[in-house]
């Protein structure tokens, strides 16, 4: 395992006007994303009592965006570094590096859009928190 960047917010350009609406764009050749997008997925209608995530990845990097609603993301990295982020602006994304445990809570109206650096591969998921802690200790 190598040392990776910390979770951090990325602000995408906001183009438009209040009377016509706005657009924000993420492209593979811009300097905002630290990876090329290989997969995009979204979640919606998640009950407010459900905690999603509860995993980390070996290789995959992600940017989580609250397209609508509010998402509370809690991240944990090696050495107990815990951060909590409130996502509620569609022009702001949260970068999640590999080996970063993360959980999400949603407002009922939240639509979560995720940009990912890898295609889906179940073998890339670390779903056991104790296994991740052991990997952190080996680093």
Please annotate each region the language model reported:
Residues 110-124:
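A short hydrophobic beta-strand segment most commonly corresponding to one strand
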Residues 87-108:
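Conserved metal-binding segment of the jelly-roll/cupin
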Residues 75-77, 106, 114-116:
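Residue-level recognition of conserved beta-strand positions in structured domain cores
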Residues 1-92, 121-130, 135-139:
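Non-catalytic, conserved peripheral segments adjacent to functional cores
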């Amino acid at each position: 395992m190598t040392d990776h960047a910390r979770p951090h917010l990325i602000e995408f350009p906001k183009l438009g006007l209040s009377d016509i609406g706005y657009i924000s764009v993420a492209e593979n050749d811009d300097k905002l994303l630290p990876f090329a997008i290989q997969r995009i997925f979204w979640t919606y209608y998640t009950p407010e009592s459900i905690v999603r995530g509860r995993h980390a990845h070996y290789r995959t990097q992600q940017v989580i965006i609250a397209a609508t609603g509010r998402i509370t993301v809690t991240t944990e990295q090696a050495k107990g570094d815990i951060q909590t982020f409130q996502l509620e602006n569609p022009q702001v994304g949260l970068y999640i590096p590999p080996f970063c445990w993360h959980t999400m809570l949603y407002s009922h109206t939240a639509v979560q859009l995720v940009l990912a650096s890898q295609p889906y591969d179940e073998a890339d998921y670390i779903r056991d928190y104790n296994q991740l802690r052991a990997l952190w200790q080996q680093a």
